[in-house]
Every structure is written in structure tokens, then in C-alpha cells.
């Protein structure tokens, strides 16, 4: 009987060991810029607490056109199953705390100056105390991935040659004026705990990858990881400043995070590229978070089949989403087959009316924008901006001709909770360059569904009035369901 009980107990312990969650943390290397505003600890359920180092990362604070650099914090870890997190604010008393995106419903408890919560899935979060969004903690809770000790392990795991692995293990690397170029059939591996001061470029390459949970930070005005004139590229896991994709095809960006603080700090640009996908990405930027442009910066052509799924956008200036504007007026280029799905927009703070719009399509240069879907997008209360800015326009600062038209745009399950959004704009340009086929389905403003048959709407009112959307000239077939 005792032997049987011992066996059962042993099997239970083995079962717990097999199925218990795991946590992997990465000590920050000497030389990397750190921030002591927060102390972060994490543990698997019932496990030992581990400290997570916090890096210093600049963000942009705008005020009436003036830009001030603020110092926020960044921390990351990998885990499986479920983890408990403690975030302690070291700079004073904590009166209020929240974890965003709010849609993730992260329940918190406050013990003194420590914010406590649990996670059961990978998330990119902002921990904010006392309403301060500029000295916050960006916390990236990653899904666990294999940790490779050397280039040989990477090569074996990916079925490639060791000489084609550019390996950066834990440590600090200052590239000076140099950069990392990733060529065809090569992999750049940036391990957790690695900090590269510099930038990397996938240039005229095919079947290339940039992977790993480490940091690539130029620490100056520069794109961190670029994909240029390339095909069949994967970027998976890093933290950096910007990830533009230009003149490329079949590019996948996933589990990547970008934070910028300088002028022209767009997060994830698409220039004249096709078949580009983004999944589980985070952008906090000092310019547009996500853009889709045609001819621009020596990249030539239109864009089709662009997909963004599971993203967090935070625009400290300019747009969370911006489409159109730039093209070659002689080519009548097209942007089409675009989907944004499952997006949290945490901020827009833009004083200039021309550049407001959490979701903006401002097409110029004879571009036609058509066949797009924006679905399951949640917008927090923004500081300054508008929800929708769809205009066939002629922006003489950046364009050489008006846009060709905006057609067949579906916006489904879009919600906004707040009071600071300005009047939205939907306008065409003339009888030939129109805006048409804009279909809102289940648009909700502060919980109220806006639709053509909504109760209490006088028959002579436009439905758009209840969403504070101005529908201007040369705009046709705008519906609310």
C-alpha cells in the first residue's frame, strides 16, 4: 500500500514538473542603457521570482509642434503556460495604475508601489502609473522559443550551413559606423540578452531571416532593421526602432517591437511591396506607426496583399495607420487587397488637421486605393486627432497630383471609447476622383452602435452625425449597418 501511494505521489510530482510553466529572463549586458524607474519580477505559477532588467528607451513628447525626448522603460521575458508579474515603481507613491491595451482585460492589484497581475498568453503591454504615459514600462511577454548557444545550433535547427548564420549571443555590441548586412540564405540571430548598438539591413536578398528576442538599437535617427529589394524574408522577435519594407515581396514580420523618438520615425512602412504580412507586432512611434505607400525613396510600384493581424499601435505623433499619399504620377499606381485585423490603437497626438486620423487614407499622386478591410479595431481615448480621415486629396507638400480615388473600404467592429476625438472626414476630390463604397458595420462610439436604423435618430439626420463624421463632396455610397 505504501509503495502504491509513493508511486502515485511520484507520478503527480512528475506530472506537475512536466506541465508547469517556464520563465526565461535575460540579464542585460554591460554597456546597455538601463532605467531604474521600475523593478520588474516574474515567476511561473508557484515558482521562484526572477528579476527582469529594464532598459532605457527614448520616446517622443510633442507639445504644439515642439518635441521633447522622454525616457521610458523596456523589459522583456519569455514564458509558457502562466506567469505572475510584479512591477514596482521606484520614483514615488503609486496612486493609480493600469495595464494596456485595456481590451486585454488584465486585472491588477496594487500593493504599496507594486502593481501585480498574471498573464496566460504572450502580450505586448504598457504599464502606466499615475496616468504617466511617457515614463511608462513597455513590457513584452514573449512566447518561449528555442535558445541557441552558438551558430552551429542555429544552423542545425534551421537546416542550413553554419557559415550562413550571423550569430550575436548575449552581450553588448557597438557597431560604430558599421552595420550588419544579411544576404541570401542567411540568418541573423540576435539572442535574448544581446544588445546591438547599430542597425541591420536585409539587402537584395532572398530567403533571409532576422530572428531572436534581443535588441537592435541604433541609438540615433536610423531604421533598426531594414528589408530592401528582397524576397522571402522573415523578421521574428527583435526589439528595434523601425522596420521598413521597400521594393520587396513575400515578407513576414512577426513578434517584433519598434519604438522611435526622432523625426521621420515611422514604425513599419511598406513601400512599393507585395505580399507582406505582420502578426503580433508593437509600434510606439514618433511618426506613423504603419504605412502603405507606392513609389517612394527609390522604391517603385504599387502595393497589394498586405495583411496586419494582432497589432498594438501608439502614435506619439502622426497616424497609427496611414495609407496612400506617395506614388509615381505617371504610373497610376494601385494599393489594394489590404487587411488590418485585431488592432489596439492606444494613442494619437497630432496637432495638424491634415495629418490626423487613427485610420487614415489620404491618397495623392494619381494613386487608386481599393478593396480594403479594417476589422476588430479598438481605439482608446486619444489626446488629439480624429478616428477616420479618408480623403482623395492634393497635398502639395508631398504630392505632385491629386489621388485617383478611394473605393470599396469595409470597416467592421470598430470601437472608440473616449471624448477627445475631433470630427472625422470622408471626402472625394472631384467627379472623376471620388470616394465610394465606404461601409461601416457595427461601429461603436462609447458603446453606442452607429447604424442607419438606430433608435432615436430623427429621419432627417445623417447617421454619420452620430459618429461625428463629416461626409463631404464627391463621396458616394457611405453606409452604416
Residue ranges and their predicted role:
Residues 349-481:
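Extracellular beta-rich repeat passengers
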Residues 2, 20-184, 195-209, 215-220, ...:
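Extracellular "leader-to-stem" segments immediately downstream of a signal peptide or signal-anchor
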Residues 185-187, 192, 206-217, 231-241, ...:
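Right-handed parallel beta-helix
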Residues 89, 119, 281-282, 312, ...:
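Non-cytosolic beta-sheet module surface loops
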Residues 8-17:
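Bacterial N-terminal signal peptides
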Residues 1-9:
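Bacterial N-terminal signal peptides that target proteins for export
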Residues 117-119, 173-187, 195-211, 217-234, ...:
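Extracellular beta-strand-rich solenoid/capping regions of secreted or surface-exposed proteins
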Residues 219-226, 240-242, 262-269, 285-299, ...:
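Extracellular beta-strand/beta-solenoid scaffold signature
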Amino acid at each position: 500500500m505504501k509503495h502504491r501511494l509513493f508511486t502515485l505521489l511520484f507520478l503527480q510530482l512528475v506530472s506537475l514538473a512536466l506541465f508547469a510553466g517556464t520563465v526565461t529572463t535575460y540579464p542585460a549586458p554591460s554597456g546597455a542603457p538601463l532605467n531604474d524607474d521600475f523593478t520588474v519580477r516574474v515567476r511561473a505559477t508557484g515558482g521562484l521570482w526572477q528579476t527582469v532588467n529594464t532598459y532605457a528607451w527614448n520616446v517622443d513628447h510633442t507639445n504644439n509642434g515642439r518635441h521633447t525626448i522622454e525616457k521610458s522603460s523596456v523589459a522583456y521575458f519569455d514564458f509558457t503556460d502562466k506567469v505572475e508579474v510584479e512591477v514596482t515603481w521606484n520614483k514615488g507613491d503609486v496612486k493609480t495604475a493600469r495595464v494596456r491595451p485595456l481590451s486585454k482585460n488584465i486585472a491588477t492589484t496594487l500593493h504599496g508601489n507594486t502593481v501585480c497581475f498574471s498573464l496566460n498568453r504572450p502580450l505586448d503591454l504598457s504599464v502606466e502609473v499615475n496616468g504617466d504615459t511617457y515614463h511608462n514600462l513597455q513590457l513584452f511577454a514573449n512566447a518561449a522559443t528555442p535558445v541557441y548557444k552558438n551558430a552551429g545550433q542555429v544552423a542545425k535547427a534551421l537546416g542550413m550551413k553554419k557559415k550562413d548564420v550571423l550569430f550575436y549571443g548575449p552581450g553588448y555590441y557597438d557597431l560604430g559606423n558599421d552595420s550588419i548586412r544579411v544576404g541570401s540564405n542567411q540568418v541573423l540571430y540576435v539572442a535574448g540578452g544581446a544588445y546591438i548598438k547599430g542597425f541591420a539591413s536585409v539587402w537584395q536578398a532572398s530567403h533571409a531571416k532576422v530572428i531572436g528576442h534581443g535588441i537592435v538599437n541604433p541609438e540615433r535617427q536610423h531604421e533598426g532593421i531594414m528589408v530592401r529589394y528582397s524576397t522571402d524574408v522573415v523578421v521574428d522577435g527583435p526589439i528595434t526602432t523601425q522596420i521598413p519594407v521597400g521594393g520587396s515581396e513575400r515578407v513576414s514580420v512577426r513578434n517584433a517591437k519598434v519604438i522611435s523618438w526622432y523625426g521621420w520615425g515611422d514604425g513599419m512602412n511598406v513601400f512599393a511591396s507585395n505580399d507582406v504580412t505582420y502578426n503580433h507586432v508593437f509600434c510606439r512611434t514618433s511618426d506613423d506607426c504603419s504605412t502603405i505607400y507606392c513609389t517612394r525613396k527609390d522604391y517603385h510600384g504599387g502595393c497589394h496583399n498586405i495583411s496586419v493581424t494582432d497589432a498594438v499601435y501608439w502614435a506619439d505623433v502622426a497616424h497609427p495607420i496611414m495609407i496612400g499619399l506617395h506614388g509615381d504620377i505617371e504610373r497610376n499606381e494601385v494599393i489594394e487587397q489590404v487587411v488590418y485585423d485585431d488592432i489596439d490603437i492606444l494613442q494619437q497626438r497630432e496637432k495638424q488637421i491634415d495629418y490626423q486620423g487613427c485610420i487614415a487614407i489620404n491618397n495623392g499622386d494619381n494613386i487608386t486605393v481599393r478593396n480594403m478591410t479594417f476589422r476588430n479595431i479598438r481605439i482608446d481615448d486619444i489626446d488629439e486627432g480624429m478616428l477616420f480621415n479618408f480623403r482623395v486629396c492634393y497635398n502639395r507638400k508631398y504630392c505632385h497630383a491629386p489621388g485617383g480615388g478611394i473605393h470599396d473600404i469595409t470597416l467592421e467592429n470598430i470601437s472608440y471609447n473616449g471624448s477627445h476625438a475631433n470630427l472625422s472626414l470622408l471626402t472625394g476630390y472631384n467627379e472623376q476622383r471620388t470616394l465610394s463604397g465606404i461601409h461601416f458595420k457595427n461601429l461603436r462610439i462609447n458603446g453606442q452602435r452607429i447604424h442607419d436604423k438606430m433608435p432615436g435618430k430623427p429621419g432627417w439626420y445623417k447617421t454619420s452625425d452620430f459618429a461625428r463624421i463629416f461626409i463631404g463632396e464627391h463621396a458616394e455610397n457611405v453606409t452604416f449597418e
